[in-house]
Design a protein with these regions (language model features):
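Active-site substrate-recognition segment that forms the wall
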Residues: 11-18, 22, 45, 80-84, ...
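Glycine-rich FAD pyrophosphate-binding loop
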Residues: 20-40
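C-terminal catalytic lobe of FAD-dependent flavoproteins
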Residues: 287-356
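Helical element adjacent to the flavin cofactor pocket in flavoenzyme catalytic cores
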Residues: 140-178, 190, 194, 198
Length: 356
């Protein structure tokens, strides 16, 4: 079977990976080069349980599948090492935000029907056993089964892997239209057995309710800081997160901003993020700002992914801020669907028939 994939972000690359390993002949199209999409602007926080604060159990299930079954297997195929750690994550709050702290845990427990088996409330002693430098915090929520991944290195390594197995990569080629079995560019019309649309915000003709949610990310180099796990600092207006990387690098950002805006990071966001991270750890006072990144994540009206299907066409979109968390499991789900004539689906709630 021949597959044409439009869109070479994380969803498109993982789908190319899955289809090739299932015996398909794959071609991959992208409107830009390999380093210019929202997948390269992510921090790589894999948090299926703490995301229950605002998401649903289906997203958590996809994320658990990705962390447990998918990511270790995918990384094992890649030509170079990719930083992936399942060492858990921490959720902290400012003493003045205790109400948000309580609401956060209640929202998660309500999703779990009060059956809490996914996080622990740590004492000060237990917290500094995990992270000795978080001395100012008296308590934290600890999610032991969460993880984080270096998504920038991952994207590069996936591209090298796809190149090494001979998958054609047609870059800097905007896809003008998609039909069942057909991808049209300015230069040529391409025919396939199945076309997979992974274009994100470029697929608004197929997903009319698609919009962009802005994400802003600051890279810091902080030799005076030794933190080992992702940290989320609760705030009533936004959720700050910090994700560590090797070499004393730290990525900090705000989870979401309701604006389809690709402009550079604002002064307000910069001040808020840097103030918050300095409150988290005074060692960030001498950190160096390496770069600032913004992009918009494709989001549907209900903040959930959707898979539209027809004979010769599958379109997946709306991964929102959960791209690296759910894309591996979604790729496996799409492969199950297309190879079983949509009879053997683990997540039928995300599927709907597409009529052009």
């Amino acid at each position: 079977m021949r597959a044409g994939i439009a869109g070479a972000g994380i969803m498109g690359r993982l789908l190319a990976f899955a289809l090739h390993n299932a015996g398909w002949q794959v071609s991959l199209f992208d409107h830009s080069n390999e380093n210019m999409n929202c997948s390269t602007a992510a921090a790589g926080l894999l948090s299926p349980f703490s995301e229950l604060d605002k998401s649903i159990l289906l997203i958590s299930s996809l994320g658990q599948e990705s962390i447990t079954n998918c990511w270790p297997r995918i990384i094992g195929h890649l030509p170079e090492s990719v930083y992936f750690q399942q060492s858990g994550s921490l959720v902290l709050c400012h003493p003045g935000d205790q109400a948000e702290w309580i609401h956060f845990s209640r929202r998660i427990l309500n999703q779990l029907n009060q059956n809490n088996c996914v996080f622990q409330k740590l004492s000060h002693e237990n917290l500094i056993t995990l992270e000795p430098e978080l001395t100012k915090f008296e308590t934290a929520y600890y999610f032991p089964n969460e993880a984080h991944i270096d998504c920038q290195t991952l994207m590069v390594s996936l591209k090298k892997y796809l190149d090494s197995i001979g998958i054609p990569y047609i870059a800097n080629t905007p896809v003008l239209s998609i039909k069942p079995g057909e991808i049209n560019t300015k230069e040529q019309r391409y025919h396939f057995d199945v076309v997979f649309d992974c274009r994100g915000l470029g697929a608004q003709t197929i997903f009319p309710d698609l919009r962009g949610i802005r994400g802003e990310l600051i890279w810091l180099h902080a030799p005076g800081v030794q933190l080992h796990r992702p940290i989320r600092l609760l705030h009533p207006r936004y959720s700050l997160y910090l994700v560590p990387r090797p070499g004393n690098l730290y990525l900090i950002g705000a989870s979401e901003i309701e604006a389809e805006d690709f402009s550079p990071v604002s002064v307000r966001t910069t001040l808020e993020l840097l103030t918050a991270v300095y409150y988290l750890h005074a060692g960030f006072d001498e950190a160096r700002i390496i770069k600032m990144v913004t992009h918009c994540r494709p989001t549907l009206a209900n903040h959930l992914p959707r898979i539209k299907f027809a004979d010769g066409l599958i379109a997946v979109n709306g991964l929102y801020r959960h791209g690296y968390l759910i894309a591996p499991a979604l790729a496996a789900e799409i492969l199950r669907g297309v190879t079983s004539n949509y009879q053997h689906l683990n997540y039928p709630e995300f599927w709907e028939s597409y009529c052009d």
